[in-house]
């Protein structure tokens, strides 16, 4: 292969990459990558709860928020579902981001106070209490849907789902009975980020 063709191939390859900044560091990403994917490629840590690379991201927990600066404007977005854009600057630990993240962790402390993982994550961010009402002190489920998505997308069974809405949302099996579709593979236990499936699994898994 000639040097001319090699240079042309490299140029075309470079044109497929998107250039932007994360925390002042120049980065490159492939078209279709998210901000979170790119950050992880460069070893930049962004906390997540509902994200797992094996399933489609939905950005439900919002813990992975980042600040995006573009054309003199700023916005906060969930990095796991935000595609990269050329020329923008992303901040993963700005004061705006940290304030939003702390507020989310306060909400999580109120919604799933029994989760050791949530309490540890909150403590890392300086959150040791919540201003919100704790309705169920024994609850550890964040309703992130990671377990149900893994059951559907990875296992292909759909043995469990998120039932009800709002504050009544819960991980359940059809008709609120133990699932006859469950193959007891334990995938939901493995991906659960809060430890809630440890007590939910016996309630929803196959008899």
Regions found by a protein language model. Name each.
Residues 23, 31, 58, 165, ...:
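Short glycine-rich loop/turn motifs that provide flexible caps or phosphate-binding loops at active sites
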Residues 4, 12-14, 50-52:
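Short, Gly/Pro- and small/polar-rich lid/capping loops
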Residues 27-76, 85-86, 99:
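N-terminal cofactor/phosphate-binding cores enriched in small/glycine residues
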Residues 1, 14, 38-41:
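Short, positively charged
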Residues 24, 52, 138:
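Aromatic-flanked redox-active Cys/Sec active sites in thiol-based oxidoreductases
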Residues 25, 57, 178-181:
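Short, conserved secondary-structure segments in the cores of folded domains
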Residues 3-8, 62, 66, 72-184, ...:
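Fe-S ferredoxin-like electron-transfer domains
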Residues 12-25:
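Eukaryote-biased recognition of intrinsically disordered, low-complexity regulatory segments
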